[in-house]
Amino acid sequence: MEKFTYNSKTAEVPSCLDEVSSEQYRQFLILSVLMNRGTISPGQFRVKWLSYLLGMKADYTMYRREIIRELDGQLEKLDGFFSYTTGKEGERIVTPILKTGRNLMQDFGGWHGVGDMLNGLTFGNFCDCLDLLQQSKQAAAEKDESTINEIFQDITLKLDRYKDPEKIPAVPSLLAIHAVNFFSAVWEMVLSGPVYIGGEAIDFRILFQKLASEDRKADDKTGWTGIVFEVAASGVFGNKKEVDDTPFWDVLLYLYKCKFEYLHQKRNKK
């Protein structure tokens, strides 16, 4: 948390995404979308975000000069919400940090999603989401907005369920953006370093570094579909359908155990 002092008072606000509430996260996501569309600038984003966190009725730049000066001098305290890089022409690029393992929109407008770190997601839906994520990258490269929107909705429907399965409305765009960001964030965590499960650090990179570095199709029997059949053949979780219905963390842990034992045996033979 960070403390902001202005107008002879002090207020404490979150310093990064992992400290925000669900309501604060939704506002941050809305501002991120507006900035991405070019509706607001990075500077306006920071002003609006700080004003919101402080509970102000308007942007603080609408207040007295003294307050503007005080808060302008403390804006660096919001740096935990943004990453800063340098562009090809030397310009500063500001990017909102949306990476978190917390599902900050688990309950939204009648929709209920999986838990933090994708807890509750089945292995089948996990594989489907990875395939859809790859398709979205291709659609983005082709600037195919309609396909991107369709893929985002498909990913959301893998992670979230509507309260009335007989009357499922269109997926809210904000929820769809969140679902893709959330899934991508957890997957990046799996690929980039140890993940803590039950207090133990598990480094899944031994499983997926090669898989992630190669452009494999999901149905080529050497990628995820092939893995499903291999696990089903072991009989640990049952047949293919039962493997698909198994929590994906359970399957990943099983694969990790198998790979770890294989590497251990390989070292002992040397």
Describe the role of every protein-language-model region.
Residues M1-K270:
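An amphipathic, hydrophobic-aromatic interaction surface with interspersed Lys/Arg
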